[in-house]
Curated annotation (Swiss-Prot):
This is DNA ligase. GO terms for cellular component: cytosol. The lineage of its organism: Bacteria, Pseudomonadati, Pseudomonadota, Gammaproteobacteria, Pseudomonadales. CDD domains: BRCT_DNA_ligase_like (cd17748), LIGANc (cd00114). DNA ligase that catalyzes the formation of phosphodiester linkages between 5'-phosphoryl and 3'-hydroxyl groups in double-stranded DNA using NAD as a coenzyme and as the energy source for the reaction. It is essential for DNA replication and repair of damaged DNA. Keywords: DNA damage, DNA repair, DNA replication, Ligase, Magnesium, Manganese, Metal-binding, NAD, Zinc. Signal peptide: none annotated. It holds the Pfam family BRCT. Its EC number is 6.5.1.2. NAD(+) binds at D35, A36, E37, Y38, D39, S84, L85, E126, R149, E186, K302, K326. Residues 711-794 form the BRCT domain. InterPro entries: BRCT_dom, BRCT_dom_sf, DisA/LigA_HHH, DNA_ligase, DNA_ligase_AS, DNA_ligase_CS, DNAligase_adenylation, DNAligase_N.
Length: 794
């Protein structure tokens, strides 16, 4: 076979493969390979066609933009094609682009020459959103048509759908817009919107999306615009097409005009001069990439002057005056070599993918999380599969999907082990207990657990590591490797054993000398008087994070009260739902856990909690009789019916004693509701449960007949604060504790409800948003003055 024949065969193969991927990406919205893999195949085809120009044909993917309109939508012919952009993957690619631009403008730039000399070129810079390109056509200021990019020449008519996107103006604002204006931009979904959409899908048993781009594309191409309207889509303009009238003479000027007409543009739009400034912008956006509210995969640079754009013109499928500088790929293909099972501190047996090493976002990845066996089943994963791996920021690499067309014939199914790979104890699937409408039911959970508890060294090590961590007991110097030594040598079999360690035992550990031994023993001693919140967090209760631990401590005031709180009582606390309430209750009801806590609180060797003592004032008499009845989940007794029963009988005892005739006399209480209540109360277990809950509400002072307490107002009560940037006098965690002690809620994001933002050096998008919203902003000195004002030490 000659070189030309081999090239022709490979070219045909690449064209077929690229066309298949284009169809899956643009028409089915089910991409089967990462963008980086597609780009590699595309560049290989480009190179082969450049070497063998006689093999170039008009139908090659390199000669047109990808995709075919779906037949269910009407077709729209783009009078000016919607072309894709050339890509830069390395810094040299960007420098080459700038050189070509300056060469093309040699006659127009001061001091220009054919070698690309002369003045630097102005470029517009903006993030490259990862969404779906669309065209919006305005006539006399009215939105008359929306269309997808399609194949660049022909798209789909999605007018009814784009009209549902809340930030797309149906009528342009202001004045001065052209009679006919085609706006081009990206429809996308923010990270928060994507997470909320998937969470809702999980709740309703619907289909979840793999990423925001797929979610945006799938939402925009719904035949029923009501579905599109229910999705959190957004639009951002980046350019224009057909125009009848005049526009500003620069790219940035046009986008700023769009903003004035109510058309959203990127807040990150910048004007720079020269290739180095472009590179600086690229680096800056790259550093802040994970802090942005939306997914991006690079930045776009465009020659700013429209006259220069026209001078430079176009190539077959892309403009010569623009380029997309891509970030290192966050998705790659690799092979699943095997699956190992790890055991965590709660006994959860978690599958971990062992992968053929591959570079993802500049890091070699050989392992990836699989979360649980339900996720393995959802992916349809088998050993030997080719899989898509994603890595974003500091997030643990994930297996996103299987490339089914590359599955080998000998691919093996993945099975959970029957026995713990560490201790050999049985592995059991968790059972979820649910109470609803007076009934208790069991269902299978997603987690498999080793039943060995602290006799399992994997669980013991992870439990100790969590117990001593900075946000828990904060035992300085007791790192993971030291914990492993303590457990492996049999010196620690429970968190309580830390407090009985002797000098000789610690001194004999690898890496310890006299000073380090004394320091560790001193750190352990210093941890004997933790706050109640730290101790609760240190216990490692499932689903109880640092914030929930603080809430429990602040609300109920003592470990004894928290330990015996019934799930129904716990749900009176804000942000504690039924599932978390049952996790807390079940943890303290467990005999093994009670023994561990008793050992930790041993009078001679254990910890002495700094307890607040009382139930917080805001929870005194917080329960109402109507709310209590509603929480019993009696079939057909909703909030309105509960209020009627409370009003009629005035007490739980009165409701329990009510006969059928009494219930039928409750005004507007439906017969089926009365019958349901009577059936519920005829079950002795239900009555006993209700009386037990009421008794505990009385004991805790939360009962509707309890005395209300005066709430002493904290100075920042009801205010939401946000911390951003670096603080020097204290860590952000410490600053957060100080503000919470003054009554503030410290949030992770800025919104119109934010009262104040504390911004240290390096503050980025949060500070920018605060300034945009006109919020109060303090620097670190301002924060310290505030703490001094209220007598808070720092």
């Amino acid at each position: 076979m000659t070189d030309t024949q081999a090239a022709a065969e490979r070219i045909a193969q690449l064209r077929t493969e690229l066309d298949t991927h284009n169809y899956r990406y643009y028409v089915l919205d089910e991409p089967s390979i990462p963008d980086a893999e597609y780009d590699r195949l595309f560049r290989e085809l480009q190179a082969l066609e450049a070497e063998h120009p006689q093999l170039l044909t008009p139908d090659s993917p390199t000669q047109r933009v990808s995709g075919t309109p779906a037949s269910a939508f009407g077709e729209v012919r783009h009078e000016i094609p919607m072309l894709s952009l050339g890509n830069a993957f390395e810094e040299q690619d960007l420098l080459d682009f700038d050189r070509r631009v300056r060469e093309g403008l040699a006659d127009l730039l001061p001091g220009g020459d054919l070698l690309g000399g002369g003045a630097e070129v102005e470029y517009s810079c903006e993030p490259k959103l990862d969404g779906l390109a669309v065209s919006l056509l305005y006539e006399n200021g009215q939105l008359v048509r929306g269309a997808t990019r399609g194949d660049g020449s022909t798209g789909e008519d999605i007018t009814s759908n784009v009209r549902t996107i809340r930030n797309v103006p149906l009528k342009l604002h202001g004045e001065g817009w052209p009679d006919i204006l085609e706006v081009r931009g990206e429809v996308f979904m923010s990270r928060a919107g994507f997470e909320a959409l998937n969470a809702k899908a999980v709740e309703t048993g619907g289909k979840t999306f793999a990423n925001p781009r797929n979610a945006a594309a799938g939402s925009l191409r719904q035949l029923d615009s009501k579905i599109t309207a229910s999705r959190p889509l957004e639009f951002c303009a980046y350019g224009f097409g057909r125009v009848s009238g005049t526009l500003p003479d620069t790219q940035v000027g046009i986008l700023e005009a769009f903003r004035g007409w109510g058309i959203p543009i990127s807040r990150e739009l910048r004007l720079v001069k020269g290739a180095q400034a472009c590179r600086d912008y690229y680096d800056d956006i790259g550093r802040r990439r994970d802090a942005l509210a939306y997914e991006i995969d690079g930045v776009v640079f465009k020659v700013n002057r429209i006259a220069f754009q026209r001078e430079l013109g176009f190539r077959a499928r892309e403009p010569r005056w623009a380029i997309a500088h891509k970030f290192p790929a966050r998705e790659e293909l690799t092979e699943l070599l095997g699956v190992e099972f790890q055991v965590g501190r709660t006994g959860a047996v978690t599958p971990v993918a062992r992968l053929k090493p591959v570079q993802v976002a500049g890091v070699t990845v050989s392992n990836a999380t699989l979360h649980n066996m339900d996720e393995v089943a959802r992916l349809g994963l088998r050993i030997g599969d080719t899989v898509v791996i994603r890595r974003a920021g500091d997030v643990i690499p994930q297996v996103m999907q299987v490339v089914l067309e590359r599955r080998p014939a000998d691919a093996q199914p993945i099975e959970v082990p029957e026995h713990c790979p560490v201790c050999g104890s049985a592995v059991e699937r968790t059972q979820l207990v649910r109470r609803s409408k007076g009934r208790e039911s069991l269902s299978e959970g997603a987690i498999y657990r080793c039943v060995g508890r602290l006799s399992c060294q994997a669980q013991l090590k992870q439990a100790i590591i969590h117990f001593v961590s900075r946000r828990a007991m904060d035992i300085d110097g007791l790192g993971d490797k030291i914990v492993e030594q303590l457990v492996d040598r049999g010196l620690v079999a429970s968190p309580a054993d830390l407090y009985t360690l002797t000098y000789d035992q610690v001194f004999e550990l690898e890496g310890f000398a006299e000073l380090s031994t004394n320091n560790l023993l001193a750190a352990i001693a210093d941890s004997r008087t933790p706050s109640l919140a730290r101790f609760i967090f240190a216990l490692g209760i499932p689903d109880v994070g640092e914030e929930t631990a603080k809430l429990l401590a602040r609300s109920l005031g003592s470990l004894e009260r928290i330990g015996k709180a019934l799930p129904e009582v716990l749900t009176y606390l804000p942000d504690v739902g039924a599932e978390v309430a049952y996790e807390i209750h079940n943890f303290f009801a467990d005999e093994h856990n009670r023994q561990v806590i008793a050992q930790l609180r041993d009078a001679e060797h254990g910890v002495q909690l700094q307890e607040e003592g009382e139930v917080a004032a805001e929870f005194a008499a917080c329960a109402s009789l109507a709310g209590f009845i509603d929480k019993l989940n009696i079939p057909f007794i909703a909030a309105t019916g509960a209020e009627k029963l409370a009003s009629r009988f005035g007490s739980l005892d009165g409701i329990i004693r009510a006969d059928w005739l009494d219930l039928r006399q409750v005004e507007r209480l439906p017969e089926r509701a009365a019958k349901s209540l009577r059936d519920f109360l005829d079950e002795p277990a239900n009555v006993q449960r209700a009386l037990a809950i009421e008794a505990q509400l009385r004991e805790f002072g939360m009962h509707w007949q309890s005395e209300r307490k005066a709430v002493e107002g904290l100075p920042l009560a009801g205010q939401t604060w946000v911390l951003t940037g670096t603080l020097e006098a204290m860590s952000r965690d410490v600053a957060k504790e100080k503000l919470e002690g003054l009554g503030a809620k410290v949030a992770g994001s800025v919104s119109a409800r934010t009262h104040c933002v504390v911004a240290g050096p390096g503050a980025g998008s949060k500070l920018a948003k605060a300034n945009e919203l006109g919020l109060k902003v303090l620097d670190e000195d301002g924060l310290l003055k505030l703490l001094d004002e209220y007598g808070v030490a720092h």
